[in-house]
Amino acid sequence: MKETGDLAVHYDTSQFGLDRSHATVATSNRTSLVVGPEGRVPPLLPEAQKRQAERAAYQREHQWDGPESRPLAERCITWPSEGPPMLAPGYNSNLQIVQGKGYVAIMQEMIHDVRIIPTDNSAHLPSNIHLYFGDSRGHWEGNTLVVDTTNFTDKTAFRGSGEKLHVVEKFTRTADDAIKYEFTVDDATAWAKPWSAEVTWAKEAGPVFEYACQEGNYGMKNNLSGARATEKKAAEAAAAKK
């Protein structure tokens, strides 16, 4: 049991945030976010399955080598939910969208990251530049903001994708307090064909609180210090046998 005054090592909504019951959710009778092509995510191609297996094998072999070998989320760099495509995780799911001349900015509560999307018809970055969030370019089709994103790094794989991931997002206000978010993902090295999903976002009064990650990131430090202690113990045991 925790003693009085102790804090849990990991995230606890009762101590560091609002309870999940405060969330505003757009409910519906749908059973899946996926809407095309057949209402389900296509199976991974053999190339993508091999890529995933190689990543998993490398992670098992080197997971305790150092900070660089730990997952991006554990290092407070990025979470898979940040996208694109942007899919709500179990917590820190709020977004704040700000429009300005030539740009749209989407501030995400998770890790307090901001996507800055030019809407000035500028070209994508050169193909040899790869980013965690990819390179996004937006334009308007009527009342719908369409965002095209390429230039991903393989470190932020989405459901088995690689650097060739291509994401098209659509943001459409359907009511004063709702936005329909649609996305289509394509990667010829991952799936035989593109697939799409959609979800409705509900408006929240706010504000979006600052997300602090490294300030309480005991997990990575404890993992690595534990690994070093285990290695030291093994080395001492081996030396004692000589």
Question: Locations of the language-model features?
Answer:
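PEST-like low-complexity, intrinsically disordered acidic/proline/serine-rich tracts
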Residues: M1-K242
